[in-house]
Amino acid sequence: KGEASYAPGAACHGADGNSGSPANPKLAGQHPEYLNKQLQEFKSGKRANAIMSGMVAALSPEDMKNISAWLGQQKAKPGFAKDKQTVALGERIYRGGIADRQIPACAGCHSPNGAGLPSQYPRLSGQHADYTTAQLSGFRDGVRQNNLTMTQVAAKLNDREIKAVSDYIAGLR
């Protein structure tokens, strides 16, 4: 059921949820609970995105659960860090945070390998760096407001740190 309902999403997110576009998230292998929450928030307007709001408008709660379950069963393709100059900084932030600025380690919630925790924290490993950068910047700048913790953490990061941690996340396995 989920695959058929997901079909319109393939244009942006890939036939199996592995988006080829760095601007669009990879959804394959993501926790179904997280995906379902995001779909509900696009539909309610709590998470603002004109394209996604239109895509989910006709979906029922059952459709959203089925899509989320199907995407969660797909195999995520690994990503790769691209900037060797910033990946070390990204690793330091991801694994240890920045204590003197009260920035917690990303790994504390999203796990050391980026697997996240079902129903609590999304899987990050292998996600496109461009997408992660856009989301962290959105949280920091108040554009994305559907997670208070992420808004508070991202508010303390500068552009260089966001880019570095995003690139590091892309290469996590």
PLM regions: where:
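Predominantly soluble domains enriched in secretory-pathway, periplasmic, or organellar proteins
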Residues: 1-4, 23, 36, 73, ...
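The feature marks the first
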Residues: 1-44
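Sequence/structural segment immediately N-terminal to covalent heme-attachment motifs in c-type
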Residues: 1-16, 83-115
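Conserved functional loop/turn residues at catalytic and ligand-binding sites
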Residues: 13-16, 31, 46, 63, ...
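Short coil/turn motifs at helix boundaries and re-entrant loops, enriched in small/polar
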Residues: 29-31, 97-100, 128, 142, ...
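Axial heme c-ligation environment in periplasmic c-type cytochrome domains
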Residues: 20-26, 41-83, 118-123, 141-173
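Extracellular/lumenal glycan-associated surfaces
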Residues: 29-33, 38, 122, 127-128, ...
